[in-house]
Curated annotation (Swiss-Prot):
The modification Phosphoserine is found at S169. As a component of the minor spliceosome, involved in the splicing of U12-type introns in pre-mRNAs. One of its GO terms (biological process) is mRNA processing. The gene is Armc7. This is Armadillo repeat-containing protein 7. It comes from Mus musculus.
Amino acid sequence: MAQKPKIDPHVGRLGYLQALVTEFQETESQDAKEQVLANLANFAYDPGNYQYLRQLQVLDLFLDSLSEENETLIKFAIGGLCNLCADKANKEHVLQAGGLPLIIGCLSSPDEETVLSAVTTLMYLSSPGSRSHPELTSLPVVQCMLRFSISASTRLRNLAQIFLEDFCSPSQVAEAHSQQAHSALGIPLPKTEAPQQP
């Protein structure tokens, strides 16, 4: 059985999170970076950690990681942002930091979990008060959701349909349908497990 890492009980939650951030910034190992980012994304589930994660600029660390070439880092980073963006202060930070293009870029990931987290994050960011961010429901995003709404993946299909129904106007959906009919271009669907042929 693996042992838990030894943590100084006097360090506390903030100290532990700071140690994770420092390890992420200082390590050269991609495996270590992936593990640390996964841990930070898991800590982002707990609203009790939000203040510490903001203080340690973990939201910016997640946003920066969306530009990495390592798909695993991107998956954990968008997962962490997804966990954090239900909170108003975190949502505002992501929007003000210019995170939307990075999150929208995750829609073209070949990894389904990354795409699911990106769609959910966009839904959190699209909640009331986000009218000043029209890129959330821009034509390319709506076209992408239309493509996802016919995905073989039930989770992706359902999430895209919710996005289209709850966050897009009927005229936006109609325009996207019309434009898609005239174009073969689009964001590719993420890879899903194909049924095995006998």
